Design a protein with these regions (language model features):
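ATP-dependent carboxylate-amine ligase
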Residues: 1-35, 63-69, 79, 149, ...
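N-terminal leader/targeting and accessory segments in enzymes
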Residues: 1-124, 278, 300, 310-313, ...
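Residue-level signal for inorganic ion chemistry
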Residues: 68, 87, 121, 138, ...
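Receiver (REC) domain switch/active-site residues of two-component response regulators
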Residues: 93, 226, 448
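Short loop/edge segments at beta-strand edges and connector loops
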Residues: 97, 112, 166, 210, ...
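Phosphate-binding loop of NTP-binding sites
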Residues: 117-278, 289-297, 543-544
Length: 548
């Protein structure tokens, strides 16, 4: 592979060739999605459908070209059915719709769920690339990204070539690039194109961060998963799922997908037989539900954690501000794992990967070596030093549980230095409102100062979001303009934090992490937390030593 290869160039080389539509018709019918086919006001039979040649698939009417199959997906703000006529005018060969449009002279496959049909269409178009890869899906509220980085490191140390789809980065072949988007699990077409590029680049495995959104919205339908990992399950995304039960059920559906069948066969890849395995956090209250679903799917279950009944169990943990040392027992034997990562929460992330190694029968020493080599993950417990007398940590924590874990780590570290924590964070607009006061209370109970600011307000009034967080902080004893400040502009909030920081304090900048933008009412605006913090420090006279 050329040193000049980029993710874009690798992806551009991947596209399905022209295909007869009848192959997709059979697939949609077998999957229980197809309700019929029509053109205008009349039904279309199999013979006519078989004569239609598809040159491309898209769910974006602006990308339609002659021969395209246009999939009309109803969205939260825009319904794709509105654009079927314009797709026809642009030369589309056919459309997939949930409701027939008799006034549009275009062959239409009428389906139960267009999003699910889009995912099946994408898998069909790109030749089911997940069947040529071992696929490791990682789900959970927190810890997915760190666990995915650790999993890739362990697999590569065991001489297993890895691709990665995740919040922070995409990796195809040996090329890894930052993910500029705010979406962890991409849309079905991009996801299947990425998997095909991995297979073409001779990756053996795809490690895929698999979100509840991606599961519930059918983005990952058509992917043949082999390993499913649960990190944990806490309060998040209720604005999308509507209830805790629906959120949990979306996560559970990943483990249901481990069942062997025509769409998810047992794979023989590179001389390795890929088992179906479920890796479950034994310390999570929902462990039993996930293990039960995995058992019904026929997967091998390996649990991990500190619970005495866990298959991979931490027996001894030593930690300092920068490292972890974990003694553990596993089916392959007892061992000690050294990590260049701080935070007791990373014990579970690492043990999940050890458990994955047990299922895949990887060399335990290679797994430990891979884990030991991970020095950090962008935007996760990232320290910033420019000679200032206080600490700065950038972290992606944006849920109540993740914020609590990070503050529980930093508060005693700051206290040992004679200081406290200044927490700078916000909460996403047009998202779960219930978590806002929860996060405010968590910060108030652990931080010396709480500065509430924008995260991604989107179209919601920023001060409404900040007030929701402030209510929780006030319940925790904070008082406005004393130890609680509401500053919508994120740069100004960081300035306020640094100006108030005392020697020994630790300033936590939470919620943005690796992200490269803030989403406002008019869309994303470029923003880099690290560069912003460095610029503020420079204004205070602190500049990093270029030699360090």
């Amino acid at each position: 592979m050329s040193d000049e290869a980029t993710i874009a160039s690798l992806m551009a080389a991947e596209g399905g060739g022209p295909q007869q539509l009848n192959g997709l018709v059979e697939r949609l019918s077998a999957g229980g999605l197809l309700r019929g086919a029509r053109e205008g006001g009349r039904a279309i039979g199999p013979t006519a459908l078989g004569e239609i040649l598809v040159e491309d698939i898209t769910d974006d009417s602006r990308a339609v070209r002659p021969g395209s199959l246009f999939v009309a997906v109803p969205g939260l703000h825009v319904d794709g059915h509105v654009f079927v006529a314009s797709a026809a005018a642009a030369g589309a060969a056919a459309a997939i719709v949930e409701r027939p449009l008799p006034d549009v002279a275009l062959p239409q496959l009428v389906v139960e769920r267009a999003a699910a049909a889009l995912a099946e269409s994408a898998a069909w178009w790109f030749g089911d690339p997940s069947r040529r890869l071992g696929v490791v899906g990682i789900t959970g509220t927190d810890g997915k990204t760190t666990t995915s980085f650790l999993a890739v490191a362990a697999l590569e140390a065991a001489d297993v070539s890895c691709g990665l789809v995740g919040t922070v980065a995409t990796q195809i072949g040996a090329v890894r690039e930052a993910n500029p988007e705010h979406t962890t699990t991409p849309g079905a077409l991009l996801l299947q194109r990425t998997l095909r590029a991995m297979a073409s680049a001779d990756n053996d495995v795809a490690v895929v961060e698999t979100t509840s959104h991606g599961l519930a919205a059918d983005r990952v339908r058509g992917i043949a998963y082999d390993i499913a990992i649960l990190t944990n399950l806490t309060h998040e995304h209720l604005e999308f799922h509507g209830s805790w039960e629906a959120y949990r059920d979306a996560k559970l559906s990943l483990f249901e997908r481990l069942a062997v069948g025509p769409a998810n066969p047992v794979k023989e890849l590179g001389g390795r037989r890929w088992p179906k395995g479920a890796i479950v956090n034994a310390d999570d209250p929902n462990a039993g539900a996930f293990a039960g679903v995995a058992q019904e799917a026929g997967a091998r279950i390996v649990t991990y954690g500190t619970d005495s009944g866990a298959d991979v169990r931490a027996t001894h943990i030593e930690e300092d501000a920068r490292r972890l040392r974990i003694g553990y027992e596993a089916p392959s034997g007892a061992a000690v794992l050294d990590l260049q990562l701080a935070g007791r929460f990373n014990v579970h992330n690492a043990l999940a990967v050890v458990a994955m190694g047990e299922v895949l029968d990887l060399d335990p020493a290679a797994v430990r070596a891979g884990l030991a080599g991970v020095r950090g993950v962008p935007g996760r417990m990232e320290r910033l030093a420019a000679g200032q007398p206080f600490g700065i940590v950038i972290d992606y924590a944006h849920s109540p549980a993740s914020l609590e874990k990070v503050l529980d780590l930093l508060a005693p570290l700051a206290a040992a230095r004679g200081g406290g924590v200044i927490a700078v964070f916000g909460s996403a607009g047009e998202r779960d409102t219930e978590k806002r006061p929860m996060m405010g209370l968590i910060a108030a109970e652990r931080a010396r100062l709480v500065i509430v600011t924008n995260e991604d307000p989107r179209g919601e009034d920023p001060m409404t979001i900040l007030e929701g967080i402030a209510r929780g902080a006030e319940d925790g004893g904070k008082r406005r303009d004393r130890d609680l400040f509401l500053i919508a502009d994120r740069r100004r909030a960081i300035e306020a934090a640094f100006e108030r920081a005392r020697p020994g304090d630790i300033v936590l900048l939470a919620g943005k992490g690796h992200e490269q933008s803030i989403i406002g009412p008019d869309g994303p605006v470029a923003y880099d937390e690290r560069q912003t913090a460095l610029a503020v420090l420079a204004g205070l006279g602190f500049v990093p030593d270029p030699a360090t």
